[in-house]
Amino acid sequence: MTSPLRKHRTSSVSSEIDPFAAAHVYYSNDTNQKSFRQARTRTYSSNQGIFSTPISGLEKPKRRGSHDDIGDHGRKFLIQVDSTLEALRKQEDTDDNHQITIEDVGPKSLPLGTATSNGFRRYDIRGTYMLSNLLQELTLAKENGREQIILDESRLNENPVNRLSRLIQGSFWDGLTRRIDGSVIEIAGRDPKDWTDDPRPRIYIPRGAPEQHAYYTKVATDRPEVRLDVCWLPEKITPEVVRDMNSKPGLLAVAMEEVIDPSTGEKTLKGLPFVVPGGRFNELYGWDSYMESLGLIVNDKVHLAKSMVQNFCFCIEHYGKILNATRSYYLCRSQPPFLTDMALRVFDKIKHEPGSLDFLKTAILAAIKEYHSVWTAEPRYDPVTGLSRYRPEGLGVPPETEASHFEHLLAPYAEKYNMTFKEFVDAYNNGRVVEKELDDYFLHDRAVRESGHDTSYRLERVCADLATIDLNSLLYKYEKDIAYTIRTFFQDKLEVPAEFCVGDMTPGQLQTSSMWDRRARGRKLAIDKYLWNKEKGMYFDYNTLKKEQCTYESATTFWAMWAGVASPQQAASLVTNALPKFEAAGGLLSGTEESRGAVGLDRPNRQWDYPYGWAPQQMLAWTGLLRYNYQEDAERLAYKWLFMITTAFVDFNGVVVEKYDVTRVVDPHKVDAEYGNQGSDFKGVAKEGFGWVNASYVYGLQIINAHMRRTLGTLTPWDQYNKAMNL
């Protein structure tokens, strides 16, 4: 039988405020006032009379109110937000960057008054981690309009793995989620990269979505102060059309759903949500979205991954491809293709829901169209090898870059033609000046951007000629996934409707698994012939112009394992010969130091080269290793990557960034390469992290075992953990 005391305690705990609730909940007036009342009502000068009847087998509750023992629920602090925040920053943020890190030289100790003593008794908050968490919590409390709060100590000394996981799931994803419709078009339609004299919100609508044109036209009419420019997209997209649109750059419409407006009761449209990478990247991006989906699915946010697949299907139907990003100047450029795997992962989570099979069918049909119209068509397809290349069309200088980005390249040409820099760019873009050398340069520059690996000495000035192991592994995966899906879910025949027909296809034409299995077998033969190097035991890119295999050692060699195109013998060779070349303290390097070559003032670092590591390379390698049953290698690499992210998070005020220097032990988030490091520039508290790094963290925690996760929470380096496990 349950005792009265046990019941009393259970009731008290059940009414307790969750100390790990999201900030907007935890710092709401109702929640924090309730926390204050609970803290005060448990402050007693004596326990006598409260539990006067001793209960057999239970220890009498300890006296409270005369000291600050932690007790069952930990300390709570009574804090005046503004004054404490000011004192904390003045004392501990010695470099005045609105962050508290191991580089600050303050005393690393600040006393706070406990709630149970009404602030009279004080307790020292010590160390970088707790103080930086305090800075973050006070910043959030202030943003939520709080002047005074009750703060649980458990929010300050929370296990860092739990804290980062919690923030990713409950805060970062929300901070990165966007949608495009009338409610946000004023913000979403503006482009920080807009170079025109009259920057204004602008949206292009494809001819196949007249309902969206009517919707946005009404938005523009109802809200003239927004100055929204609603434009029809030209029916035929050519490099010349895209170039001419650069004088009026704009957002591209994405998928919307029909809903009922609660205020009017009438039908209207609402944008399907998507997750952006973060930092200055605020549109729907290509392969970022796939990587993010891996984490979204882990965090039970499959609805976001599903809507991103639907957005991609819309893009393929109306723009012909999954775009680099949804701005008009990206219309000729795609990114690494992951749609089939993304759709199958989502389908696996929603297959019990009505309409799930239609969702999968649409995604596979869209992938078939993309495969034929983009990746196995001119100019990307190489008929000699049967392999594909990143080789987008386009004219002139990429307009989305900073004006000064190409100044060193173009200045001599401007001088040659006796023009200013701006005059020369305009003349070159519009064909009044023809320079074959520049044409070749920008062909490869666009290809590098399409590859997602911008920039790298692996690809510089050659990318458009390369049949890369990464792209062809992805296309092999498309072929196998499409064959599997048609065979497993559609009785081995899939009818192609008119909107997804391409080339000489006719509406109603059937696709069968054997067609796609045959394509996969052919691609594997070509990959083995041109990209596999038996002597070195790894894959390399192939230069289709020079007709020779490249020598740059890239972590994309492991994409063959992710896709399943490597034989068991090739996979074993990769683990034996390639893996040691790329493994570093923080996980996998993008490339080897030897391949990168010397760097200096005239040859600076490139962000996709040594010594940098990126989340996509880690996740694809882990998955590939597990596919071939190299579980220990996958766990080791995942642990190293997670440890690096966690230590930077602990030591540098909760930072989570786009990329890391995986050779740096102390401050791996500090990257000396072009474009800086998105996610590091914040004041007080990070609210987004970075999309695919967020995903890699929660996805990686699924790779390591439970013991590793506990050890990770104690910030134990891999070598120390491994040594202890092998005593």
Curated annotation (Swiss-Prot):
Q: Which UniProt keywords apply?
A: Calcium, Cytoplasm, Glycosidase, Hydrolase, Metal-binding
**Listed cofactors:** Ca(2+)
One GO MF term attached to the UniProt entry: calcium ion binding
EC top class, as a word: hydrolase
Q: What is catalysed by this protein? A: alpha,alpha-trehalose + H2O = alpha-D-glucose + beta-D-glucose
* Listed pathway(s): Carbohydrate degradation
Q: What is its EC number?
A: 3.2.1.28
> Known PROSITE patterns for this protein?
TREHALASE_1 (PS00927), TREHALASE_2 (PS00928)
Q: What happens when the gene is disrupted?
A: Increases cellular trehalose levels. Decreases conidial germination frequency. Resistance to thermal stress.
* Positions that bind Ca(2+): D93, D95, N97, Q99, D104
Instruction: Spell out the residue ranges making up region: Disordered.
Output: 47-72
Family, per entry: Belongs to the glycosyl hydrolase 37 family.
What this protein is reported to do is described as: Hydrolyzes intracellular trehalose to glucose. The disaccharide trehalose serves as a storage carbohydrate that is mobilized during conidial germination. Regulates the level of trehalose as a protectant for cell integrity.
What name does the UniProt record give this protein?
Answer: Cytosolic neutral trehalase
Per the record, the gene is TRE1
